[in-house]
Amino acid sequence: MRRFRAAISTVLLLTSVFAAELKLKVVDPHSAAVAGARVAVLLENQTTPLKVLTTSSDGSISPTNLADGNYRVEVLAPGFAAYSANLKLPADANFTATLSLATVTETVVVSATRYPLPVNETGASVSTLESGELTNMQPVALNDSLRFLPGAVINTAGQRGGLASLFVRGGDSTYNKAFIDGVPVDEPGGTLNLGVVPLQSVDRLELLRGAQSTLYGSDAMTSVLQLYSRTGSSETPEILFGADGGNLWTAHGYGSVSGARGRFDYNVFADQFNTEGQNINDDYSNSLQGMNVGTRLSSFAFLRFRLRHSNSRTGVQGEWSFNGDPIYPPDEDQHARENDLLANLELTIAGPSQWQHHFSGYEYNHRTLNEDTVSDRGCDPTVFNFFDCYFNDTVHINRAGFNYQGDYTPRTWLQTTVGYEFEDENGYFNSIFVNSDPNGNFGQGFTHGLRLNQAVFLQQRLTRGRFSLIAGFRYVHNASFGDRVVPRVAASYVLQHGGQIFSGTRLRFAYAQGIKEPTFEESFGITGTFPALPNPNLKAEENRSYEAGLEQTFFAGRYALSAAYFNNQFRNQIEFTTDPITFEGFFLNLNRSFAQGAEVEFKGSISSHLQLDSAYNYTSTQILDAPGASSPNATGDPLLRRPKHSGSLLLNYFARGWGGNLGGSFVGRRPDSDFLGLGYDHAAGYALVNVGGWYNVHPRITLYANIENLLNRHYEEVVGYPALFLNFRAGLRFRLGGG
């Protein structure tokens, strides 16, 4: 027995002596560390990963128990091209992987599969805005940047801070699931105001089009939107601060402190924006504070905490100018407030073997108030004039949840993802609407809604030769609509690899289902002067979605042309109705509608400094069934605010010491309504052109300027709500410390 133990000890000793420790660091083209990259370590000429790890804040991994020999490392990091290299231990024990900027088809994205993967292998339609592009654009809020992405149509009711909605592939504005740092930030049922979401310290934005409920659950009916905060990476602390101002009494200031040292990284940031606006009661202000901190617990475990808080106030003019005709004066006293707080704690564990585990817990607190305290434009219920009556709408939503995701990679061409989600949706809301209240008291009577939802999901990826397949399903237990199974399958095939000019042709197809839970008001009713009864028996709204597309690259991947056809069948859509006998109102699953169309995108690198992304979208919609509804929402009518023709253009120039961008959003005539009986049944088409630029007057001082609505055109994204005319901002940005 003693001899056996001695032999085992000798073997272990020899193993430790001849085992090599690899220290690999992942950096970008400027030698800055890349955190969060997925690194697979394999034996040379093998497809089974020995280790699958995620880089820490300093861009490094340190896999242990690797014997001397020949290996291959494969690196996937969002925003970069996929990287692969051979190395030999112990000679390459300290190895640096320098990532390159991706060609138009090589960009690595996360949202399509919930883990890093080159976009051309996802079988999905994904568009991105990277940190440099966002810096060029200097958007005030999320809607200011999204409008320049392919397939996105933005409708903002008003100007800065106005209610801004996203329409994708003919779906409703509530058919989009939005996340900030992994936290869902829409209300249950999909409501989200994009116009008050600031983008300070956002490093990356991804828009995934198509039904995506298999991976993301309720509300992901036509798109998923993901925002990712910047992480600190420089060993020396970096202090970034700046300020800008412009016409309309606009003032903006911001700052951040970030860095990474040892096991820790950090990014603490703040932002304040104020403007008086273009007309009466058109002011907007928003303050933001946040942090993104992480620590490496061990060579295989990493913990990250994210916190973000914003508080906005918006003057609401209401409807007053219809296609350039100012029929009414703007409302002088209506205003809207929104206060949002999110927190997310995420633990990533590598192993054992080819597994990666992600555990996260989050909470999102969302409060809104929209009120009008003075009837300055007229209110007389005796003649059914409710144009400018007193009202007070209050919403308080809290979403808290726990998520688990496990990624198993037995081969480089095979990956399985499993997950579990639990969410507590809790909310209080009311809608008080009266014709007179001299004391300003709107009463109480809040409605309470509560849902406890659970889900499990499974996804399988297979890539063999020219063929790629991604298939999965989600089983949902929702407290409102019960149990559902939601499938998705996406396949792509490389028709030809091509040559120097035609460098690759890929066909793709996807079938998916999407679901959307009822809003709290629809399920639990509304209090107030015009109440709605609760309906606990509402079904989930559904989308049956097909898409098929072609992708063609040119000149060794420098340019890409893609075209996709989509077909959406929406059913069980929820509509408000009234009992003709009791005159009580409530919500029912009544409507069906249809949307089909095409998306064409051309993008490329015109030169090493100039990038182009252009798109054209055609969308045809129709209401198939709307019992009891009248125009403009009757059976046979097109869906409101969905243009048949729209397009976008984005040019970005990056050089040493200076850069700039040109953005264009082109939206055709679309059906709309004033809902006041004035006869306005459409919103006119428009072309919005923005420009921006920056120049380094010193290596650490940057001068920048941005102009919105360069052509100074009148336009209305929502009929009755004129947008801003030409407006500009200019400022200075300072950087202290850092790399």
Model-derived features with residue positions:
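Membrane-embedded beta-barrel scaffold of Gram-negative outer-membrane proteins
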Residues: 108, 259, 263-264, 354-374, ...
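Short, acidic, small-residue-rich periplasmic hinge/interaction motif at the N-terminus
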Residues: 29-30, 40-42, 76-80, 90-135, ...
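Gram-negative outer-membrane beta-barrel transporters
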Residues: 416, 462-469, 566-569, 588-674, ...
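Extracytoplasmic beta-strand/coil segments of soluble accessory domains associated
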Residues: 126, 143-184, 203
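Conserved C-terminal beta-signal and adjacent last beta-strands/turns
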Residues: 256, 295-297, 509, 638-739
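Structural signature of Gram-negative outer-membrane beta-barrels, strongest in the C-terminal barrel
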Residues: 307, 409-415, 421, 444-568, ...
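Short acidic/polar hinge/loop motifs at secondary-structure boundaries
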Residues: 183-209, 228
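Transmembrane beta-barrel wall of Gram-negative outer-membrane proteins
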Residues: 247-274, 279-315, 333-356, 410-416
